[in-house]
Design a protein with these regions (language model features):
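Small/aliphatic-rich secondary-structure junction motif
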Residues: 1-60, 140-143, 153-178
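Short low-complexity stretches enriched in small and charged residues
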Residues: 46-52, 66-76, 111-119, 141-147, ...
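Conserved phosphate-coordination/catalytic loops
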Residues: 12, 72-75, 96-99, 128, ...
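Conserved short-loop catalytic and cofactor-binding motifs
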Residues: 9, 69, 93, 121-125, ...
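Structural beta-alpha unit
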Residues: 39-42, 65-68, 72-115
Length: 178
Protein backbone atom coordinates (compact mmCIF):
# COMPACT_ATOMS: atom_id res chain seq x y z
CA UNK A 1 0.00 0.00 0.00
CA UNK A 2 1.25 3.44 -0.90
CA UNK A 3 1.24 6.27 1.63
CA UNK A 4 -0.42 9.23 -0.10
CA UNK A 5 -0.84 12.29 2.12
CA UNK A 6 -2.87 15.38 1.34
CA UNK A 7 -1.94 18.47 3.32
CA UNK A 8 -4.60 20.80 4.71
CA UNK A 9 -4.54 23.89 6.89
CA UNK A 10 -6.71 22.67 9.77
CA UNK A 11 -8.47 26.05 9.85
CA UNK A 12 -9.19 26.25 6.08
CA UNK A 13 -10.31 22.90 4.63
CA UNK A 14 -10.80 22.78 0.84
CA UNK A 15 -13.11 20.06 -0.46
CA UNK A 16 -12.29 20.99 -4.09
CA UNK A 17 -8.73 19.73 -3.71
CA UNK A 18 -10.05 16.35 -2.59
CA UNK A 19 -11.53 15.42 -6.00
CA UNK A 20 -8.04 15.42 -7.51
CA UNK A 21 -6.63 13.37 -4.64
CA UNK A 22 -9.50 10.89 -4.86
CA UNK A 23 -8.66 10.24 -8.51
CA UNK A 24 -4.99 9.61 -7.66
CA UNK A 25 -5.89 7.35 -4.73
CA UNK A 26 -8.39 5.29 -6.74
CA UNK A 27 -5.82 4.84 -9.51
CA UNK A 28 -3.13 3.68 -7.08
CA UNK A 29 -5.46 1.48 -5.02
CA UNK A 30 -4.47 2.97 -1.68
CA UNK A 31 -6.08 5.13 0.99
CA UNK A 32 -5.78 8.88 1.43
CA UNK A 33 -4.27 10.34 4.57
CA UNK A 34 -5.49 13.85 5.31
CA UNK A 35 -2.86 15.68 7.34
CA UNK A 36 -4.44 18.65 9.08
CA UNK A 37 -1.76 21.06 10.29
CA UNK A 38 -2.50 23.51 13.09
CA UNK A 39 -0.02 26.39 12.99
CA UNK A 40 1.07 27.09 16.56
CA UNK A 41 4.18 29.09 15.68
CA UNK A 42 2.45 32.39 16.50
CA UNK A 43 1.44 31.20 19.96
CA UNK A 44 4.83 30.40 21.44
CA UNK A 45 6.97 33.12 19.89
CA UNK A 46 7.41 36.02 22.29
CA UNK A 47 7.75 39.39 20.61
CA UNK A 48 9.57 42.53 21.63
CA UNK A 49 7.34 45.59 21.98
CA UNK A 50 7.87 49.14 23.13
CA UNK A 51 5.56 51.45 25.10
CA UNK A 52 6.57 54.95 26.21
CA UNK A 53 10.20 54.22 25.39
CA UNK A 54 10.31 51.05 27.48
CA UNK A 55 10.91 47.65 25.90
CA UNK A 56 9.03 44.60 27.10
CA UNK A 57 8.50 41.04 25.92
CA UNK A 58 4.98 40.11 24.97
CA UNK A 59 3.90 36.50 24.59
CA UNK A 60 0.65 35.57 22.90
CA UNK A 61 -1.48 33.41 25.17
CA UNK A 62 -4.75 32.05 23.82
CA UNK A 63 -7.83 32.09 26.00
CA UNK A 64 -9.76 28.88 26.51
CA UNK A 65 -12.49 30.26 24.20
CA UNK A 66 -9.95 30.87 21.41
CA UNK A 67 -8.48 27.40 21.87
CA UNK A 68 -11.97 25.88 21.74
CA UNK A 69 -12.78 27.81 18.55
CA UNK A 70 -9.59 26.51 16.91
CA UNK A 71 -10.42 22.96 18.02
CA UNK A 72 -14.01 23.24 16.76
CA UNK A 73 -12.83 24.48 13.35
CA UNK A 74 -10.31 21.64 13.15
CA UNK A 75 -12.96 19.08 14.10
CA UNK A 76 -15.29 20.48 11.42
CA UNK A 77 -12.48 20.25 8.83
CA UNK A 78 -11.76 16.63 9.74
CA UNK A 79 -15.47 15.75 9.59
CA UNK A 80 -15.80 17.42 6.16
CA UNK A 81 -12.74 15.46 4.95
CA UNK A 82 -14.16 12.14 6.10
CA UNK A 83 -17.53 12.93 4.53
CA UNK A 84 -15.87 13.92 1.23
CA UNK A 85 -13.87 10.67 1.25
CA UNK A 86 -17.12 8.72 1.64
CA UNK A 87 -18.68 10.66 -1.25
CA UNK A 88 -15.69 9.82 -3.47
CA UNK A 89 -15.73 6.16 -2.36
CA UNK A 90 -12.19 6.17 -1.00
CA UNK A 91 -10.75 5.24 2.37
CA UNK A 92 -9.74 8.34 4.30
CA UNK A 93 -7.58 8.62 7.40
CA UNK A 94 -7.36 11.96 9.22
CA UNK A 95 -4.34 13.03 11.25
CA UNK A 96 -4.09 16.34 13.12
CA UNK A 97 -0.66 17.76 13.99
CA UNK A 98 0.19 20.94 15.85
CA UNK A 99 3.39 22.89 15.46
CA UNK A 100 5.37 24.81 12.88
CA UNK A 101 3.98 23.78 9.47
CA UNK A 102 7.29 23.78 7.57
CA UNK A 103 8.92 21.49 10.13
CA UNK A 104 5.92 19.15 10.31
CA UNK A 105 5.70 18.77 6.54
CA UNK A 106 9.43 18.23 6.06
CA UNK A 107 9.35 15.45 8.65
CA UNK A 108 6.17 13.90 7.21
CA UNK A 109 7.66 13.94 3.70
CA UNK A 110 10.27 11.42 4.84
CA UNK A 111 7.61 8.83 5.58
CA UNK A 112 5.19 9.14 2.69
CA UNK A 113 5.30 8.07 -0.94
CA UNK A 114 3.58 11.19 -2.23
CA UNK A 115 2.24 14.50 -0.92
CA UNK A 116 -0.62 16.37 -2.50
CA UNK A 117 -0.92 20.05 -1.70
CA UNK A 118 -2.96 22.98 -2.97
CA UNK A 119 -0.80 25.72 -4.52
CA UNK A 120 -2.86 28.14 -2.39
CA UNK A 121 -1.78 26.56 0.92
CA UNK A 122 -0.54 29.27 3.23
CA UNK A 123 -0.58 29.66 6.97
CA UNK A 124 -0.10 33.43 6.88
CA UNK A 125 -2.87 34.51 4.50
CA UNK A 126 -0.61 34.99 1.48
CA UNK A 127 -2.53 35.18 -1.82
CA UNK A 128 0.19 34.42 -4.41
CA UNK A 129 -0.16 31.24 -6.49
CA UNK A 130 1.78 29.18 -5.60
CA UNK A 131 2.54 30.64 -2.21
CA UNK A 132 6.03 31.06 -0.80
CA UNK A 133 5.15 28.32 1.69
CA UNK A 134 4.45 25.91 -1.19
CA UNK A 135 7.69 26.92 -2.98
CA UNK A 136 9.63 26.16 0.19
CA UNK A 137 7.79 22.86 0.64
CA UNK A 138 8.64 21.83 -2.93
CA UNK A 139 12.32 22.55 -2.26
CA UNK A 140 12.46 20.83 1.14
CA UNK A 141 10.22 17.79 0.63
CA UNK A 142 11.81 14.36 0.55
CA UNK A 143 9.07 12.80 -1.60
CA UNK A 144 7.16 13.71 -4.77
CA UNK A 145 4.77 16.62 -4.24
CA UNK A 146 1.75 17.06 -6.51
CA UNK A 147 0.08 20.44 -6.73
CA UNK A 148 -3.67 19.98 -6.94
CA UNK A 149 -5.65 22.08 -9.43
CA UNK A 150 -8.37 24.47 -8.27
CA UNK A 151 -10.97 22.62 -10.31
CA UNK A 152 -10.42 19.01 -11.28
CA UNK A 153 -11.89 17.26 -14.33
CA UNK A 154 -9.34 14.61 -15.23
CA UNK A 155 -5.57 14.24 -15.58
CA UNK A 156 -4.43 15.15 -19.10
CA UNK A 157 -0.73 15.65 -18.50
CA UNK A 158 1.88 15.60 -15.77
CA UNK A 159 4.53 18.32 -15.68
CA UNK A 160 7.64 17.57 -13.64
CA UNK A 161 9.84 20.34 -12.27
CA UNK A 162 13.51 19.35 -12.02
CA UNK A 163 16.20 21.57 -10.54
CA UNK A 164 19.08 19.10 -10.87
CA UNK A 165 19.27 18.26 -7.18
CA UNK A 166 19.58 14.76 -5.74
CA UNK A 167 16.26 15.10 -3.93
CA UNK A 168 14.49 16.05 -7.18
CA UNK A 169 15.98 13.00 -8.92
CA UNK A 170 14.82 10.78 -6.07
CA UNK A 171 11.32 12.33 -6.12
CA UNK A 172 10.98 11.75 -9.87
CA UNK A 173 12.00 8.12 -9.44
CA UNK A 174 9.52 7.68 -6.57
CA UNK A 175 6.77 9.26 -8.68
CA UNK A 176 7.50 6.85 -11.53
CA UNK A 177 6.99 3.92 -9.12
CA UNK A 178 3.53 5.22 -8.23
Amino acid sequence: MKRIVQIFDAQNFSAEALAFSASIVRHSGSSLIGLFVQDTSFINDPGMNIIAGQFYVEEIVLTSEEKQKIQDTTDASVAAFMQACEQHNITGIAIVKQGIPAEILKTESRYCDMMIVSPLLSFDGEQAVPTVFVYNLLAAAECPVLLSPERFQNIDEVIIAFDGSKSASFAIRQFAYM
